[in-house]
Amino acid sequence: MTTWKFERPKQLPREKYITKVFSRYTLEDFVFYRNKIIEIEDEKARDFLMLALVDSAIKASWTMKDGAVVKIDKRGKPPLKKFFKYKVKRMFKDLRNANMKPVETVADIGNARELNLENETIDAVITSPPYLNKIEYTKIYSIEMSFLGFPDTRIKSHIGSRVEDVSVSEIGLDENLPLSAKVYFKDMNSALKEMYRVCKNNAKAAIVIGGGCFPDRAIESDRITAELAERIGFKTEETSLPLFTVTLTIRKES
């Protein structure tokens, strides 16, 4: 990284949602580093540095995440180069301190309702599904997703995104639920079934999920998800409720 000699990029991103939150100098630095990282042949090193770069670019931007809103603050920020070098050093330090053993890992984009996994092959699951009636995080992280090459439409096409009416009586739920809630829990039920299928006996799963708010009511997504899981065959061991987020630990029964 220290041997890279800066060259002003000939082309910069032109999307309005990007140009309005970055100075020209920050964008030039980002594109320069991105182009250099893309040239790295080692995939792990390339991904490692690209992750550090995207995180650093956001810190050097004028964006400020405030809950479900992205605000713009054009007060002076240190140059991207400073953030990037600090981030890479911090990530290297974390790797050294973690003392992780080399294991095979696989990262994939798929569908939680149709897992590409064999039956009873998983020991543990940790997941945070999309929250009911909450899609603003696709907007909050739109810049990061764009920089990493992921279209936000792929995210929105997942759990609870369909608009056609569905029946939920067969999974034991009230048909008077709002349409988006019915679609959401129908999908969640499918995801839980798949989770049950791939989990080994006595496997454990932790699900972080938040409640859903509608104009006429609040829906306890944690309670409903726990009920769906128990009907499928899981055993609810623990439920905790810090603010509006619940963690369910469920155990597959013998």
Region roles according to the model:
Residues C199-N201:
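Helix-to-beta-strand junctions that scaffold the AdoMet/dcAdoMet cofactor pocket
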Residues F48, A203-K204:
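Short glycine-centered segments of the SAM/dcSAM-binding site in methyltransferase folds
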Residues S190-E194, E220-G233:
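Short alpha-helix
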Residues S23-T127, L132-E136:
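SAM-dependent nucleic-acid methyltransferase catalytic core
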Residues Y131-E194:
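SAM-dependent methyltransferase catalytic-core segment centered on the flexible catalytic loop
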Residues P13-V21, L177-K186, V208-I209, C213-R223:
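Acceptor-substrate binding/catalytic loop of class I
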Residues M1-K36, F147-I171:
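Conserved phosphoryl-transfer catalytic core
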Residues L228, F234-S254:
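Class I S-adenosyl-L-methionine
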